[in-house]
Structure formats: C-alpha cells, structure tokens
C-alpha cells in the first residue's frame, strides 16, 4: 500500500475486498477463511498475509500452466447468467483472465461482497438498469444532489461490446501479442499498449501503415477528449444555476433527471 492509502486508512478504513485484485495471496486467503469472511473485513487485517504482487498463479494453473480463473466474482457473474465458465474455449480465456479484475464492479451489502453487475447483460444500459433496480449508487453529486454511478474500469465490457470483441479478438491479442524465441511461440508478458508493437498487434489484421493506424487511434480516442473542458465548464455553470435560491424545487428536480 502506498503512503496516501495508509493515510486514508486512518480516516476511513477500506474493506478487505479491495485486496481482491492485488495479489496471488488472495485466493489462498479466501480458501483458508472463506470468501464471505475475506470480503467482510478491513484492509489492514490481511496486511501481513498479502505480500506478493500479481504473478503467474493469478492467471495460470500452477501445475499445468493452463489459463484458469482464480477469483470467485467472475465465476459467480457467469453462473448468474446461466453460463459455465469452465467450458470456455482458449481464445475467450485470453480475455477472461483479464476480466477477473479489469471490469465494472461494486461491493454488495454490508458484507462488501464483490459483485459484477452483469445479470442483465454487459451493455451500459443493462448495467444501469441493474443498479437502478438494486437501488445502488456510488455517491450523490454535491451540487445537483443526483445519485451518481462511477464506472470503475469496465475494460472487459467495453472490449466485448466493441467491434474487436465481436470479431473474437482477445485482450492478449492486442496487449500480449505472440512472439517467437528459440523456435517457440508464446505470449509476450510485457503487457503494454498495442501501439508499442503495431507490427505484432494491429497489423496482424489491419494492412494500413503504422502512421495511418496511429492517426486512427488519435482521431477516435484523443481528439474527442480535448474538447472535454469546454462542455464540462458549461455543464458545471448550468448546475450551479440550478442550485441558486431563485430556482424552484420542481424545476431543479426536472432538470436533474438529465
């Protein structure tokens, strides 16, 4: 834990659920004391037990080195959808090992049980409906007093709903592309941006030049974000006006729905 997290622990102790994606020691602790007991505790309670960084056993079976799922939340999310994750094919597993952590989630109930809100599907609309019916929100906006959901890091959901996921491209295809050394082909475990190795990632499927592919990413991902400060400033100004004394409550509630 870093210094800022330790300082935060003094003010408001974090749930031990926060350890879930931090170490291969987590599955061991879950097996020893039970999943419910692991979640329903404080972060500091396991500080002397969880000491190793993310490692091989988080994604690989220690005996066979096959890809496997080591975190219960993902298995449970599949089960609630009527799916058996143990029947997943290798190409899908090259994404699912990532989906153990790189997903949207929340801590359910007083026991802080780690839950993926996929019961109705993985689209934004389906997840929003799940939260609405559960009556859950991450916080209430200080100005508008509107309940707010804060997406954690829904990387897997975005990938699966996008064109690459629909075409069967896995997380590893782009972030851990295959390489060959000594006559052996294996996944590069130096996990990084696909743009760092375009010849082994994008250009496996896309025949455009490296410059064109980089520009495509810029146009889709970077350029829209640079316009954010303008609309954000206007939005905050609008919210401030809504909370002025001259705005009637009915008008405020109507506007807050948007």
Roles of regions detected by a PLM:
Residues 1, 31-173, 177-258:
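Primarily the internal scaffold of c-type cytochrome electron-transfer domains
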Residues 1-15, 20:
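N-terminal alpha-helical interaction blocks
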Residues 11-14, 23, 49-52:
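Active-site-adjacent structural elements in enzyme catalytic domains
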Residues 14-27, 59:
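Long, hydrophobic/aromatic-enriched structural stretches that serve as scaffold segments
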């Amino acid at each position: 834990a870093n210094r800022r997290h330790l300082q935060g622990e003094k003010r408001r102790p974090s749930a031990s659920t926060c350890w879930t994606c931090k170490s291969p020691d987590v599955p061991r602790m879950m097996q020893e004391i039970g999943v419910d007991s692991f979640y329903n505790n404080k972060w500091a309670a396991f500080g002397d037990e969880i000491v190793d960084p993310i490692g091989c056993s988080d994604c690989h079976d220690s005996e066979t080195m096959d890809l496997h799922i080591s975190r219960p939340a993902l298995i449970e999310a599949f089960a609630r959808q009527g799916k058996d994750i143990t029947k997943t094919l290798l190409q899908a597993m090259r994404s699912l090992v990532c989906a153990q952590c790189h997903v949207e989630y929340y801590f359910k109930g007083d026991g802080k049980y780690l839950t993926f809100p996929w019961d109705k599907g993985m689209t934004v609309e389906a997840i929003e409906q799940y939260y609405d019916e559960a009556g859950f929100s991450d916080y209430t906006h200080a100005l508008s007093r509107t309940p707010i959901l804060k997406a954690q890091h829904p990387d897997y959901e975005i990938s699966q709903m996008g064109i690459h996921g629909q075409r069967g491209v896995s997380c590893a295809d782009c972030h851990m592309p295959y390489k060959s050394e000594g006559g052996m082909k294996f996944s590069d475990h130096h996990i990084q941006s696909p743009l760092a190795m375009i010849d082994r990632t994008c250009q496996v499927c896309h025949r455009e030049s490296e410059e064109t592919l980089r520009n495509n990413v810029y146009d889709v991902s970077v350029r829209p974000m640079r316009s954010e400060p303008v609309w954000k400033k206007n939005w905050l100004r609008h919210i401030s006006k809504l909370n002025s004394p001259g705005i009637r409550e009915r008008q405020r509630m109507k506007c807050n729905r948007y």
